[in-house]
Amino acid sequence: MSNIPAELKYSKEHEWLRKEADGTYTVGITEHAQELLGDMVFVDLPEVGATVSAGDDCAVAESVKAASDIYAPVSGEIVAVNDALSDSPELVNSEPYAGGWIFKIKASDESELESLLDATAYEALLEDE
């Protein structure tokens, strides 16, 4: 079973979301998602300053197996991207919840967080797949 940190929120599309001390949210893909995709070869990052809506595809993770869209779990403004992925996309595989984060977003509507899954619900989703 994949590692599913309890403090994170999850989307049904296998993105995770972590609230930071400054009020922004860090987004990445789950350990389960990176296991399905396999070894990352490239991550197409969103533009800092771009405004996205929840569910918008805003990044792409390319692996040896496939290219997969990464969706914004909440609406808001992209405030940072993980430039380390340009040289080291494999961080998404080795550290999906730490060094392999993809972007940070300033949420424009925090009520959207209510539609995300907690760790227990995400684990149940994986068991149903």
UniProtKB/Swiss-Prot annotation:
GO biological process: glycine decarboxylation via glycine cleavage system
Cofactor comment: Binds 1 lipoyl cofactor covalently.
Residue numbers bearing the N6-lipoyllysine modification: 65
GO-annotated cellular components: cytosol; glycine cleavage complex
SUPFAM superfamilies attached to this UniProt entry: Single hybrid motif
Cofactor(s) listed in the protein's UniProt record: (R)-lipoate
Keywords: Lipoyl
Pfam families on file: GCV_H (PF01597)
Domain Lipoyl-binding: from-to ranges: 24-106
Record flagged with keyword Iron-sulfur: no
UniProt function note: The glycine cleavage system catalyzes the degradation of glycine. The H protein shuttles the methylamine group of glycine from the P protein to the T protein.
Assembly with partners or alone: The glycine cleavage system is composed of four proteins: P, T, L and H.
Family from the record: Belongs to the GcvH family.
Record protein name field: Glycine cleavage system H protein
Organism the protein comes from: Escherichia coli O6:H1 (strain CFT073 / ATCC 700928 / UPEC)
